Amino acid sequence: MKTANSAHEGAALRHSRLEGQTAESLKDYYSGRKLYGDDFNLNEIREWYQLEENACYEVYDQGRKRMPNNDHLHWCCGYRHVLADRPGLGKVLGLGSGNGEEFRPVRKRIEHLYIVESAAGYLKNDATTTYAKAQVDGSLTFPDSFFDTAVNIAVLHHIPNVTHVLSELFRVLKPGGYCLVKEPITTLGAWHQSRKAGLCPCERGFPRSLLDEMAQRAGFEIVRKTYYEFPPLRHVRDGLGIDTYNSIFWTAFDILCCKLTDWNYRYHRVNWFQKLAPSYVFLVLRKPAANKND
């Protein structure tokens, strides 16, 4: 079975399901009608897991490389809507949260943080954080209705069987609990071709309407939806080292650009003009509250 032991090696590897595939044979996935990976069998899921298990950890130099600071984005598009009707986040699940950097804006509002993570290098418990190793099939080893809040910051697109994982997130949330989902809404390039540097072997984004449908099929209500990341501004961030999503101005300007170019959205983008459209979504989901008459 293939493994990804470094960012360089991981970028060169790809899932065996892609061997011999073409744009034509993958057209149902590139068109956004289906989500690639969601129909994989257990052996295919296991291969994907081994390719992705440590890939992000290696891309960020085993956790030593600085990640962009997205605190303002996470607050304005996610946490503030959860905290609008309650004083704290309670018991929180961070799926694929690595070192937990996405919780900086709200750490004092968390009763206890549980992080489910595939990369063993991140698994270091402390007084306020408990780590658990991610299961190959995405199942969560927690009781029903255990968490008040679940946070998934750019992690679901690294997982093949997303339908199952969304159902697990729904299961472990208390009625009335919130689930934050931040994900790319493009293919992230052609999967059957060589991957761009900096991408993990199997990651792919979501067709935005399909992601909505999948969340709703799992049982969630969509409370709020924000499209963001206008690609030219991403190049400003990466090229100049500006934390655009920790800036009130840059975040607002980016969201405005995405609203103005929403008409140009498509999932699979093959030229520069098609890339002038929002490329990420931030969803605030809620598990419906229990019926008082039950």
Predicted regions and their residues:
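A short beta-strand submotif of the Rossmann-like class I SAM-dependent methyltransferase core
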Residues: 152-155
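Class I SAM-dependent methyltransferase SAM/SAH-binding core
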Residues: 93-139
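Short alpha-helix
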Residues: 203-219, 224-225
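A C-terminal cap/extension of S-adenosyl-L-methionine-dependent methyltransferases
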Residues: 2-5, 15, 131, 230-294
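Conserved class I S-adenosyl-L-methionine
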Residues: 2-87, 105, 178-204
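A short acidic, Gly/Pro-enriched loop at the edge of an enzyme's catalytic core
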Residues: 138-150
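A short glycine-rich, Lys/Arg-flanked "PGG" loop and its adjoining helix->strand segment in the class I
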Residues: 163-178
